[in-house]
Every structure is written in C-alpha cells, then in structure tokens.
Amino acid sequence: TYTVRVVSISDQGCTDTAEKTVIVYPKAKTNFTIGSTPQCILGNKFNYVSSTTIKSGTYTLNWQYGDGLTAGNVNSTSHNYSNVHNYNVRLFSTSNFGCLDTVTKQIKTLPMPNAGFTYNYDQKCLKGNDFQFSTNSTVSNGTPMNHNWFYGDNDSTINSTFGQHTYQTDGPFVVRLISSTNIGGCKDTLNKTVNVFPMPLASFTIDNNKQCFKGNQYGFA
C-alpha cells in the first residue's frame, strides 16, 4: 500500500495538499519442474510439478503442453506426446486480483531406432562355421548408436557395429541385436535365427581286409 501526495502551490505561495492511497497487488512467481527430458517417443510420459509461489492472496494455474493440449488449475500434471519434436511447455498463473505471470520451458521427444542387420550365412556346418554380422540399424535424426550382439549361446559382443561368432555345438540359435541411441537410450531389438548343422560320422566295415591278389574281392559296408 502506498500513499500518493500532491502539493499545489499558487503564484502567491498558497498551498494545498491532496492524498490518495494506491494498492499494488503481488503477482505469483511462476515456476515448475520437469521430471525427465529428453525422453524416447515410445512410452514417453512427462511429469510437471508447479513450484509457483505468491506473497499474499491466491492464484490459479493453466498449463499449455505445446502440442495444442492444455490442463486446468492443477498443481501437478503429466502428458504423453505423439510426435518427435521440441515442445515449449508454458505455465500461466493468475492471482485473485488478476495479475498474470508465465514461464516457458522446452522438452524434447526422441525418435526410436530401427534395428537391422545382415549376415554372411544363415546356416553352416558345425566344422569351420564362422558367422559374421553387420548392423544396418537407422534412426531418423542420425543420433549415434550403440549395438550389442547376443548370439544365443551365452556369448555376446558389446558396443560394436560388427559381430563375429563361431558356435561350438550344433543347433538353431537366435541372434539378437539391440541398437540404442547414445542420447536418451532409445532401444530397438531384432532377432534372426541361424542354424548350425551337426557333422556326419563317417564309418564303414570291410568283410575281409586281407586277401590274396589273385581273386581278391573286398566287400564294404
């Protein structure tokens, strides 16, 4: 509350005084926190909590999520975004005397990678098998990625664009590639099956392995 005084002085030195009281109402100091940003677009959930304060009086809040959607007078709220983008989130406060304040913060949603890989063979005999794998995973914004290979026999290669493996036993094996972005850790997984065939066991018998040259006739089975 302030008192405004005006003093009028005539040319002859006569004075008069007038006073009036003015009131300056406080506005809220608007602020909010964000739970986590950036987040992967798949399964994203952004949590916002107001930390707005006011010296005296009350206020109401209004949220704008930056994608055209809003929330009313709530202290905390959460929101899911449908597209990969940078969003400006705004919180508005209005005091009970109509004083306005606002704050804006930016959040980001990140694209998911698309895991992919090629191999030199999808099947080999056990003896001398040597499988080689190469990733062709992509992500729309070109963010660097890590690639982890799991060969289906408790062996793996971590953080490599290429995988190479020799199997010690026959069987079908599921090769798994997990590609994840360096920023945000957004992940995609791709499985492919390779087959390792058992080696045949060569064996035969001879009915009589010692015979005279004349008239010899060997039988093999």
Locate the predicted segments by residue:
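Extracellular/lumenal mature domains of secreted and surface-exposed proteins
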Residues: T1-A221
